[in-house]
Amino acid sequence: MDLNSASSVVLQVLTQATSQDTAVLKPAEEQLKQWETQPGFYSVLLNIFTNHTLDINVRWLAVLYFKHGIDRYWRRVAPHALSEEEKSTLRAGLITNFNEPINQIATQIAVLIAKVARLDCPRQWPELIPTLVESVKVQDDLRQHRALLTFYHVTKTLASKRLAADRKLFYDLASGIYNFACSLWNHHTDTFLQHVSSGNEAAVLSSLERTLLSLKVLRKLTVNGFVEPHKNMEVMGFLHGIFERLKQFLECSRSIGTDNVCRDRLEKTIILFTKVLLDFLDQHPISFTPLIQRSLEFSVSYVFTEVGEGVTFERFIVQCMNLIKMIVKNYAYKPSKNFEDSSPETLEAHKIKMAFFTYPTLTEICRRLVSHYFLLTEEELTMWEEDPEGFTVEETGGDSWKYSLRPCTEVLFIDIFHEYNQTLTPVLLEMMQTLEGPTNVEDMNALLIKDAVYNAVGLAAFELFDSVDFDQWFKTQLLPELQVSHNRYKPLRRRVIWLIGQWISVKFKSDLRPMLYEAICNLLQDQDLVVRIETATTLKLTVDDFEFRTDQFLPYLETMFTLLFQLLQQVTECDTKMHVLHVLSCVIERVNVQIRPYVGCLVQYLPLLWKQSEEHNMLRCAILTTLIHLVQGLGADSKNLYPFLLPVIQLSTDVSQPPHVYLLEDGLELWLVTLENSPCVTPELLRIFQNMSPLLELSSENLRTCFKIINGYIFLSSTEFLQTYAAGLCQSFYELLPEITTEGQVQVLKVVENALKVNPVLGPQMFQRILPCVFRGVIEGERYPVVMSIYLAVMGRVLLQNTSFFSSLLNEMGHEFNQEMDQLLGNVIEMWVDRMDNITQPERKKLSALALLSLLPSDNSVIQDKFCGIINISVEALHDVMTEDPETRTYKDCMLMSQHEEPKVTEDEEPPTEQDKRKKMLALKDPVHTVSLQQFIYEKLKAQQEILGEQGFQSLMETVDTEIVTQLQEFLQGF
């Protein structure tokens, strides 16, 4: 691409590509896409975006195309890679002038220089760093800033490289420029502090921006640039200097008010100082040891004493608390139980910590956390009134403690209390004792203090296990507080019910549950929505608890379910509806079939909620979870839900529909439990199986559930299902088998085994295409025992229950292996006998014995040759399935099932599903459970004897080991 002639053409097309008119925009984008691989295109783009007279939008687009080009074509091995000559020209052009006037474009240029540096620096671009170092020294403000901006992005990018060779290069770079970076930062910081006192706002902002950028560079060099940073005097000097600088900047915040244009940048710089300390502590805990004392003194004084008044702000307090927390919790500072096993560095750090956290310091921190930071703020109380649902779902999970004040204070309290519980337990107990009895509803401050102390007692529940008689406290103090219905008392009603939820799994007597359920029923009718939502949460914790007893809960079930349902209707926010649905699901799951009389209202409401939640996939996930538990609770009655249930399953498991990304896992689970609880198949239930084929193609972690669903259909309606879907299913399995893991192969073949078990006539025909590979696996001696076991189970089913099909399969395989049928059968029996040890389940061992015995009686010489092996297998199976009656000394087959056997269901066990009943009916027709192995062997041997005569039979029996014969005779006593 000739630069001079091409520039105007490219400029014109870029201008068209900034158009709002798609008729102009689309062809321009297409043309630019074609030019991406043209030599010289990126040189033209460089000329365009460095020409400050051109339109800003056009230059912006040129930078973006250049940046994408680096990602796609800069590497030498990339298809259509840029030539080394062009890259060399581009590198030189990028760092010729640092004079971009537009901030956004300057940032993009800095980022793309960093991208090139990641690939080429220092080997192909040794001049980059020296050029940047010189450029940040110039007097021109704009050039200096742009060079510093680029310096930061390059440092950040090089610091992020993780390969050992790249790390080594970055260490070399850091040690080479660290002194310069420190002096640069000090210079800009001093300049800023001078400007602050002069009152020149523009100069203050400009110097502060440079201070921030130079500090960002230092952060990356300090944290990522040294293997043992504590051995470098400059690094440790910089880190120690941070505390003094922080004090200076915090003092500046007194003079720079909240409405000042510099305020935001100032706070960012203060936070960046703390990030340097936090990152350094995270990456180099041992190197941080000399900084522990100073960090703790600094953080504690600003957060827990009057030193911080008037200068601290929320994000800074959070960072200081995180610094304290990371020092308290750091494993590198915790000695082993046996002190001698700990490193000197660990012992030194531990000593510094112990010297700092004295009794007075810990007591003051604990008291300040509870009486100051735990108090509900004016802002929170206003939110409670104006947006109760927003108040209840305030972010408290995951990493919120790193950024938000309330979760941060609570996590710090938990960690300090855990670490120093012997010191702090008496302090908290004393706080509790001062708050005994009811609190005056007119004294809002006293109510908030009590709320804060109760919060601490809840958070420290595990630590206070031995120190608080919670059952007594519940009866004498907490229960009466829940009964105070005054509106101003609602913070305490909410806090007390929350507190009980925290203690439920720690220490709460089972006998007190009914009293708690009574209280929950009352609070679910509280006038305040926040109290009702908190009560629902505690109900979930109570029902979820290990010691939950259904019999205690049942008297309150109807009331609670009705009130929870009302709450579900009352709340409007998606998150709150999800939360209440989870509580309902939990209740349904625990009481199971007992829920049936009370679910009518919920069943009617869920379709409406599903419709309303079209845009809220996470809420739909919660609805799916609720439906799963509902179907399990309703059992066969869940058929009445099909008009709503089946379209929901259809949508959730349709991979062509966008929502499946969120809904698939729960949708498959719902599909499975629907099948398990279905009393009979319906055309609609059969129809949604059309979704299965694409799901099998996905080969995702959901395959196991998919196989369970297929089995569910086979048990539910084998003939109809197999006639409709077996051909497609067989094709999917055929394609899937070579691609999947051993475990996956077993799952596929279990489906085939079930089809053969349920429908011995139709099954083999339907899966005809898969059976040769099973046969092949047996003949060739499949090496994985679990796979061989399932191969033999499938073969056993065909041989035992569909002999004619087995003969045709044997014939087909004879042609493939170029062997006579008898010879091939002999090889199969030999391998079967040899690999019988691969079968671990007694049912399958018995199946193998029955299958091979079914070849008898026979005058076929091959089968007679293998007679010894068949008897060996049969006796092995007898050992596994026969139990001896100690009184009569006779044996009976423990696999046999009778029509009248009803399994006893204990109170803790779930009642059998419809699928369990179908499996029981199937077992009653299965030879494994209906044919006595003892009798079968006896009859087969008798028939063989009749064919061969006494002498011939005796000769045959002599081929069997005498010990085996003795065992066989013992088992056959009485026949």
Swiss-Prot record:
Localization terms from the record: Cytoplasm; Nucleus
Ranges for the HEAT repeats: 123-160, 283-317, 318-356, 422-459, 473-509, 511-548, 555-593, 600-636, 640-677, 683-720, 731-773, 819-849, 850-887, 957-974
GO molecular function: nuclear import signal receptor activity; small GTPase binding
Known partners and oligomeric status: Interacts with UBE2E3 and RPL12.
Annotated source species: Mus musculus (Mouse)
GO biological process, any: ribosomal protein import into nucleus
Modified residues (N-acetylmethionine): 1
Lineage: Eukaryota, Metazoa, Chordata, Craniata, Vertebrata
Protein encoded by which gene: Ipo11
InterPro entries: ARM-like (IPR011989), ARM-type_fold (IPR016024), Importin-beta_N (IPR001494)
Protein name (Swiss-Prot/TrEMBL): Importin-11
Family: Belongs to the importin beta family.
GO cellular component, one term: cytosol
Main function: Functions in nuclear protein import as nuclear transport receptor. Serves as receptor for nuclear localization signals (NLS) in cargo substrates. Is thought to mediate docking of the importin/substrate complex to the nuclear pore complex (NPC) through binding to nucleoporin and the complex is subsequently translocated through the pore by an energy requiring, Ran-dependent mechanism. At the nucleoplasmic side of the NPC, Ran binds to the importin, the importin/substrate complex dissociates and importin is re-exported from the nucleus to the cytoplasm where GTP hydrolysis releases Ran.
Residue positions, PTM Phosphoserine: 343
Domain Importin N-terminal: 28-100
